[in-house]
């Protein structure tokens, strides 16, 4: 975290306790602005700073891309390996790796040299991408996705920490906003780039190999131009002692909780029935590890309050809780749109990967425009609660209109609906700027991590639940429709993988129309989750304080 200047606050006992905990109460208003002296400037300037920014932000762009790049190549990947039952893991695996590792890596950045930890995470990401690109089977690509996701989480946190350390307090809001914007742009460009590779002679494998090329180009900047940034909390202690400070009990329980719950969601209704004993066992394990994790954090088992994995002290601040919920709702709605708008066009219009991704452009353009407009106007107009309320209302309207889409809905109408949903994304990255204004300067990085946890967990759970809804409903619907028609379970699972399946093209016209009805109805049901996220977004916005940003 950046070296903070003196921070003052009223001497009321309640407020002093909040400051001691790194939190300011809602009544005290936002953290006072850190005044920047005229001689306070960045330690890195000029061309060197420009190159560092390009290299660091390129890593953030790659992280965003890899979150969603499989949205338009999953059909090609599943077709290559003829493994359709594990299709959901292509998207979920990356996000799972990110969520499991984001908490321990966040703590590691507080005690290890930021530069070398960042480079280590980049190397993990590149290694995982290499495994995905060269994967001989579906299991290998799933392992690669989880591995790359773990490294990607470290890349994202590294971006936030590097920006916080290397910029002045006055510059930080702008650069932190850029981190969120570039990540978001990467997420929505992922399907376009993935689709382009999947439809080209390069094949889907280059959707992963491209990461290695960019990493190779930027590596000299990371190694030779990025300054070494040892953390004060880790000074004077050996590598082993710093490792011991990490909350290993919390890390193991967090991993077990997330993995078992995602297995429960992804496998249920697809690999085996929801009531299967294996699925019930996974649910029980997830519940037990969740309770154990909460207890380990509350009682600081084999750790202390300073080093425990989850920053639980932020749960005492209602505004921070509301921002956490808002980040979660926004992340879930974003991933539903990015994954399922192209999927609709692949099925209904027979679009190629690149063409179906191009159909996202109305959503993309308004997403980017509203994020930029919000970042520029929100500090000028003040009361950020109004921006959040408007964003939530448009999220509900956009999701609700997407829910009404049928296989014969006009394309122009769908573009209009996606624009409404894009307008609802205006404040989905704003918490990265609002959150730090609510805490003392020495807790800024932790507040950003807190928001990132909400975003990452929602994307993981949202994507897993959406995949489970789509696959289970489509599978059961097509099984009922095509029963006795001579199609195997593998043929039907292949159809669910996307437009590359020949089953839909071979069906008689009337049967194809009914099959598309089943598929589109399943996609519509996925948007119910986005509607719920938007409704909760509006409710959570009402708990934000009516004060100026």
From Swiss-Prot:
Keyword Ubl conjugation appears in the UniProt entry: no
CC per GO annotation: plasma membrane; vacuolar membrane
GO terms classed as biological process: patulin biosynthetic process
Chain spans, region Disordered: 1-40
Chain segments annotated as transmembrane: 50-70, 85-105, 116-136, 146-166, 178-198, 206-226, 252-272, 282-302, 321-341, 360-380, 385-405, 419-439, 460-482, 526-546
Major localisation: membrane
Gene3D superfamilies: MFS general substrate transporter like domains
One of the record's GO molecular function terms: transmembrane transporter activity
Residue stretches of biased makeup (Polar residues): 1-12
Localization, UniProt: Vacuole membrane; Cell membrane
Applied value in biotechnology: Patulin was originally used as an antibiotic and specifically trialed to be used against the common cold, but it is no longer used for that purpose since it has been shown to induce immunological, neurological and gastrointestinal effects. Genotoxic effects of patulin with dose-dependent increase in DNA strand breaks in brain, liver and kidneys have been detected in mice. However, more recently, it has been proposed that patulin might also have anti-tumor properties.
Mode of membrane association: Multi-pass membrane protein
Pfam families, per database record: MFS_1
Sorted UniProt keywords: Cell membrane, Membrane, Transmembrane, Transmembrane helix, Transport, Vacuole
Function summary: Efflux pump; part of the gene cluster that mediates the biosynthesis of patulin, an acetate-derived tetraketide mycotoxin produced by several fungal species that shows antimicrobial properties against several bacteria. May be involved in the secretion of E-ascladiol to be converted to patulin by the secreted patulin synthase patE.
Family: Belongs to the major facilitator superfamily. TCR/Tet family.
Name of the featured protein: Efflux pump patC
The gene coding this protein: patC
